[in-house]
């Protein structure tokens, strides 16, 4: 074992974490950025929370890193309580050791299956955070029901992004009841949100995303639960279908059914709230969280100001129109000079969000080459 620091928290973790070994406690240091962002986003949500008690659940605890950081780092004037569960007895033991290490008394630990723990706490938690290895689908129904408090928050990670991005089409249809589309990674999180919205609607619950990102090998979203059939209907109205036009390489929305060449349903509404993003960014900066977390939040802050599903990949576009790829910064400047909004995206170094049309980009790139060569 070794002791490390994440954010403002000390953690005892295994020297090596190997999933193939039976009874091994899993800790993933690569996900520190994920946890930095998560604490920042939940803090932003908590800043507007009006009740005296705030109850959270991390039902897939592992080493306890996520739940313990919530318990230790979230600032709240009322009573903050965190429930952490894991089916692995070695994980439960490590979580308890980490509680002692941080001198925390506001955490309850459960040696229990995640679905059992959530089902026992129907409508109890203000926040449920599903962070599994793989797909969140097996835990989603019980996670939704456990977070049905008024204005609850459901956080969800999927590490099966190859499935969500279309590499395994049949698996995606089977697990998410949706047809994936290869290409833009943002569509992975939009497909995941779309599935969650459909799941919640059967309980007359609407889900409203307030923050989403696609980083490394995972997609992640935070959704507020809103009660009532009307709220569920409003959420469903944001579902739609997308077709990647083989001639123009553009995305087009389609609202009715599966037709040849169309994929979905995807959530086509806003997936990150501008105020939540900005407040999360300020929290991450004030607490000196990892530079990478801050960089991602800064990019999402800019992205969230432009209403566009997905992005334009400049490499892909130039390949299609048979032009050399100009410096991305030059294209951005040209767009701004022509009155368009534009931002880089956090998940693709060659991706741009803009209110310009595809035809505008083609013209600007062609003009750039005519002036340069």
Curated annotation (Swiss-Prot):
EC number(s) in its UniProt entry?
2.1.1.216
**Keyword set, alphabetical order:** Methyltransferase, RNA-binding, S-adenosyl-L-methionine, Transferase, tRNA processing, tRNA-binding
What disulfide bonds does the UniProt entry report for this chain?
A: none
Q: In Gene Ontology terms, what is a biological process of this protein?
A: tRNA N2-guanine methylation
InterPro entries xrefs: SAM-dependent_MTases_sf, Trm1, TRM1_arc_bac, tRNA_met_Trm1_C
Q: Superkingdom of the source?
A: Archaea
Question: Which reaction is catalysed here?
Answer: guanosine(26) in tRNA + 2 S-adenosyl-L-methionine = N(2)-dimethylguanosine(26) in tRNA + 2 S-adenosyl-L-homocysteine + 2 H(+)
Locate the Trm1 methyltransferase domain: which residues? 2-365
Residue sites binding S-adenosyl-L-methionine per the record: 35, 66, 86, 113-114
**One MF term from GO for this chain?**
tRNA (guanine(26)-N2)-dimethyltransferase activity
- Give the protein's biological function: Dimethylates a single guanine residue at position 26 of a number of tRNAs using S-adenosyl-L-methionine as donor of the methyl groups.
Q: Which family does it belong to?
A: Belongs to the class I-like SAM-binding methyltransferase superfamily. Trm1 family.
Concerning PANTHER family, the annotation shows:
N 2 ,N 2 -DIMETHYLGUANOSINE TRNA METHYLTRANSFERASE, TRNA (GUANINE(26)-N(2))-DIMETHYLTRANSFERASE
Which NCBIfam families does the record match to this protein? TRM1
| Name of the protein described by the UniProt record | tRNA (guanine(26)-N(2))-dimethyltransferase
Q: Look up and give the organism this protein is from.
A: Methanococcus maripaludis (strain C7 / ATCC BAA-1331)
Q: Which gene encodes it?
A: trm1
